[in-house]
Amino acid sequence: MMITLTGHTLTVEEMKRLLLEGEGVTACPTSMQKVAECREVVEKIVEDGKVVYGITTGFGKFSDVLIQKDDVKALQHNLIQSHACGIGDPFPEEVSRGMLILRANTMLKGVSGVRPLVVNMLLEFVNRKIHPVVPQQGSLGASGDLAPLSHLALVLLGEGEVFYKGKRVHAMVALTEEGLEPIELEAKEGLALINGTQAMTAQGVLSYIEAEATAYQAELIASMTIEGLQGIIDAFDENVHKARGYKEQVDVASRIRDILHDSKLTTKQGELRVQDAYSLRCIPQVHGASWQVLNYVKEKLEIEMNAATDNPLIFDGGEKVISGGNFHGQPIAFAMDFLKVGMAELANISERRIERLVNPQLNDLPPFLSPEPGLQSGAMIMQYAAASLVSENKTLAHPASVDSIPSSANQEDHVSMGTIASRHAHQIIQNVRRVLSIEMICAMQAAEYRGIENMSTVTKSFYHQGRQQVPSIKNDRIFSTDIENIAHWLKTNYSIKERLDVNAAL
């Protein structure tokens, strides 16, 4: 099944299918017609010798340098090569694939001035699964993601490297095997390819998809912990949460009630104790607040995915060619910093639940869930690992968006650092998943002490799936492997491709 790009209607759900399920893309014919019409404007500007930034001038501080007609093609090639200054490890393939898709989508708005050939080449790369090797570091987030997108543009020219059929190869190797010819960029096309926010946005979309799945998983794992600690179910009563009024909080409480509806391990208020600690009692309030963050982030991503972030932009059949600043990544920088905080908090509260599962002063379970306390340490150091991860997250959660540094001889004197924010958000999500993996290992062990037969239908099913990944703790062993196995399972096999539907599990 192909997803049609229009420049206006792309959604996160469609990106999930494109990035994680390998679906292909096609261009809306009406949108392609707009691309062709806009291109005619650019060619007339070049033919008439008009002075228009980015078309017949240099770039950045060189915007006052007029480029002769015969040098326009050389200008495009020089731009791409000189701006390909990315450094560090490459983005995941899903991100570079996302960059191709988002760049094509923004061009289909018909205000960038590229030839339809350029859009078609981007789509060919997507559909043939030729993904540029794009270094993660080197972007200031304004003028957009210049360095990362230059590495994307290189491969269209037959330069640079790509991921192709499971290997990292020179771009020409993939082009030759697929029977594709590299393109030669013409006026405006180099700038149209690299002036935008598609690196931070593509990474942001992947981060959001993983964060959404992780947030659902956090509720299921927290529910297992509630059982392991014989938590008080009254705290999740609908009346409590409707009295506050936040929809996300109400929804979390509702899902946890559904998960635990037939559990024999939860207790009533006053049965064992009057109230639970905040890390149990306030799950809906805390997790619900993280869902508020996720909803905000999704909204901003879907706007940016369909945004014209090029410069200059061409309107009204060429009557207006305007230099603006839509390449500035501040909206995504803020959204990614917000995502970092919202996800880090899920790990913070999870680590506190881990402590309550392993600390003998806080429960009636064996110390550190050890089969032979003293002789065997059990889950003692797993809590250390979780504490380390949440502390690392606190450092990564420092906002990148409050930083700025001038560039291009002070012409570009304020930047967003949105790509740094987006990269750090993804790192935090990996850490959160590992903390939740530790909580799950501890919660499964606690459930065994309480009696698996007493678990709810949903948590019992989840327990058995988890036990297919890691065995019960009968003796001390290398727990690092267990943590990574659960984390890998949560990411790839449980609900990364489709969000957890609790009701379907009931």
Swiss-Prot record:
Name of the encoding gene: hutH
Modifications made to the protein after synthesis: Contains an active site 4-methylidene-imidazol-5-one (MIO), which is formed autocatalytically by cyclization and dehydration of residues Ala-Ser-Gly.
Family the UniProt entry places it in: Belongs to the PAL/histidase family.
Enzyme Commission no: 4.3.1.3
Location in or out of the cell: Cytoplasm
Catalytic activity field: L-histidine = trans-urocanate + NH4(+)
GO cellular component: cytoplasm
InterPro entries: Aromatic_Lyase (IPR001106), Fumarase/histidase_N (IPR024083), HutH (IPR005921), L-Aspartase-like (IPR008948), Phe/His_NH3-lyase_AS (IPR022313)
Signal peptide bounds: none
Keywords of the record: Cytoplasm, Histidine metabolism, Lyase
Protein known as: Histidine ammonia-lyase
Major localization listed first in the record, in broad terms: cytoplasm
HAMAP family membership: His_ammonia_lyase
CDD domains in UniProt: PAL-HAL
Gene3D superfamilies according to UniProt: Fumarase/aspartase (Central domain), Fumarase/aspartase (N-terminal domain)
Gene Ontology molecular function terms on file: histidine ammonia-lyase activity
